[in-house]
UniProtKB/Swiss-Prot annotation:
This is Phosphonoacetaldehyde hydrolase. GO terms for molecular function: magnesium ion binding; phosphoglycolate phosphatase activity; phosphonoacetaldehyde hydrolase activity. The gene is phnX. Keywords: Hydrolase, Magnesium, Metal-binding, Schiff base. It catalyses: phosphonoacetaldehyde + H2O = acetaldehyde + phosphate + H(+). It comes from Bacillus cereus (strain AH820).
Length: 264
C-alpha cells in the first residue's frame, strides 16, 4: 500500500489557525437580528458549505426557539438567504487577513512532494471566497496542486464529491491510496464517505477553537483534556487517525504503508 496523494482542508487545517475568519461573522449576522448565538454553536456546523452552515444554525433547537420568540415564526428561507448575503459581504472584506499558512504546514507539504505525493484540497468556502484565500496563501508559500470547492461539484461535505474530483484531476486511484485530513466533523465524514484514510488534526482546528496564544498560555492539564475531547469527537465521526500537529502526518503515512493496513 502506497499513499499517493493527500487531500487537505483549508481553514483550521492548513491556514487560519483556529478557524476564526468565519466564526465572528456567523455570530454577528444573528446578533444583528437580536438572536445571540455562542461560539460553540457557531462552530458546530463548521466545514459545511457556508449557506448550509447558516441553515444548520437556524435549525438548532435553541436558536430556532429564540428566533421564534423574537419574530413569532421560525426562520424562513428568505431569512437564511439574507443572512448569507450579509455573511459573504463581511467575510470577503476580512478573508485576506486569515489566509496565513499554519506553522509547519509548508515544510510538511515540501517533504510530501519530495516523496512524489500529490497535494489536493477541499473546503467549505465558495469558489469566490477561495479565490481570495488561495491567492493570499500562495503569496505566503502555500499552494496545493489542486483545489475543489462546493461550487465545483453537485454538493459539498459530507458528500464525497470534492474528494472524487481531486482524485480524478490528480490521477490517483483507488481511493484508499489517498489521505483526507481536516479539522472538523464534516471533514471526517467527507473522507470516510470517499473511502479514504481519514485524519483529524487537533491543534489549530475549529473543533478545538483556540488561538495560538490561548494554546500557549493554557494550563497543560486543561489543554490536554480539551485535546482528548476533540480526539474522541474525530474518532466517533470516522477518523482512522488523529494527530495534534501536521508534523505527525508522515508518521501516520508510514504506519499505513509499513503495516499494510486496510480501511475498515
Amino acid at each position: 500500500m502506497k499513499i499517493e496523494a493527500v487531500i487537505f482542508d483549508w481553514a483550521g487545517t492548513t491556514v487560519d489557525y483556529g478557524c476564526f475568519a468565519p466564526l465572528e461573522v456567523f455570530m454577528e449576522i444573528f446578533h444583528k437580528r437580536g438572536v445571540g448565538i455562542t461560539a460553540e454553536e457557531a462552530r458546530k456546523p463548521m466545514g459545511l458549505l457556508k449557506i448550509d452552515h447558516v441553515r444548520a444554525l437556524t435549525e438548532m433547537p435553541r436558536i430556532a426557539n429564540e428566533w421564534n420568540r423574537i419574530f413569532g415564526q421560525l426562520p424562513t428561507e428568505t431569512d437564511i438567504q439574507e443572512m448569507y448575503e450579509e455573511f459573504e459581504e463581511i467575510l470577503f472584506a476580512i478573508l485576506p487577513r486569515y489566509a496565513s499558512p499554519i506553522h509547519g504546514v509548508k515544510e510538511v507539504i515540501a517533504s510530501l512532494r519530495e516523496r512524489g505525493i500529490k497535494i489536493g484540497s477541499t473546503t467549505g468556502y465558495t469558489r469566490e471566497m477561495m479565490d481570495i484565500v488561495a491567492k493570499e496563501a500562495a503569496l505566503q508559500g502555500y499552494k496545493p496542486d489542486f483545489l475543489v470547492t462546493p461550487d465545483d461539484v453537485p454538493a459539498g461535505r459530507p458528500y464525497p464529491w470534492m474528494c472524487y474530483k481531486n482524485a480524478m484531476e490528480l490521477g490517483v486511484y483507488p481511493m484508499n491510496h489517498m489521505i483526507k485530513i481536516g479539522d472538523t466533523v464534516s471533514d471526517m465524514k467527507e473522507g470516510r464517505n470517499a473511502g479514504m484514510w481519514t485524519v483529524g488534526v487537533i491543534l489549530g482546528s475549529s473543533e478545538l477553537g483556540l488561538s495560538e496564544e490561548e494554546v500557549e498560555n493554557m494550563d497543560s492539564a486543561e489543554l490536554r483534556e480539551k485535546i482528548e475531547v476533540v480526539r474522541n469527537r474525530f474518532v466517533e465521526n470516522g477518523a482512522h487517525f488523529t494527530i495534534e500537529t501536521m508534523q505527525e502526518l508522515e508518521s501516520v503515512m508510514e504506519r499505513i504503508e509499513k503495516q499494510e493496513l486496510i480501511i475498515s
